[in-house]
């Protein structure tokens, strides 16, 4: 239920809803807490800003706790950030939490599988420029 992608200075960790959260909930599944703990421990060892982003499918939610998918996606990202801060020596200034609701789908929302792929939390690590890249950018400016 976890995918990891890496480019030059970005690491993307994609967590599918089914592993981390029950449907319509922002409470981390107890079976998944250790996974978040490992991710947090690993991220504490590297530099960079960490953006935790919550995403949903386009099926409306309207509960007392989560009146909309905006609320649910935001609450899920905050739950992950809180857990990471609780278990790893991460400065809070390195982390942000954002909810995107259904505005950034990965798949079409017309199928069960597509909706499942869209329900996710992504941890995006933006690593700082190395000295050579930084010098090159300064020259361009």
Where are these regions (language model features)?
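Short secondary-structure junction motifs
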Residues: 1, 47-49, 92, 118
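Short edge beta-strands and adjacent turn/loop segments
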Residues: 2-14
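Beta-strand-connecting loop/turn residues
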Residues: 9-11, 48, 102
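Periplasmic OmpA-like peptidoglycan-binding domain that tethers envelope proteins to the cell wall
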Residues: 14, 20-33, 55-137, 141
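Structured segments of extracytoplasmic/periplasmic soluble domains
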Residues: 39-49, 80-83, 87
């Amino acid at each position: 239920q976890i995918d990891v992608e890496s480019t030059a200075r970005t690491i993307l960790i994609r967590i599918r809803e089914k592993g981390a959260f029950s449907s319509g909930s922002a409470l981390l599944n107890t079976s998944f807490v250790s996974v978040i703990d490992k991710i947090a421990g690993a991220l504490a060892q590297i530099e960079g800003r960490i953006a935790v982003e919550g995403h949903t499918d386009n099926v409306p939610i309207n509960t007392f706790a989560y009146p909309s998918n905006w609320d649910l996606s935001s609450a899920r990202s905050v739950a992950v950030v809180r857990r990471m801060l609780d278990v790893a020596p991460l400065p809070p200034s390195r982390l942000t939490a954002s909810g995107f609701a259904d505005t950034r789908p990965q798949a079409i929302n017309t199928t069960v599988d597509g909706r499942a792929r869209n329900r996710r939390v992504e941890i995006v690590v933006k690593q700082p420029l190395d000295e050579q890249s930084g010098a090159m950018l300064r020259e361009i400016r």
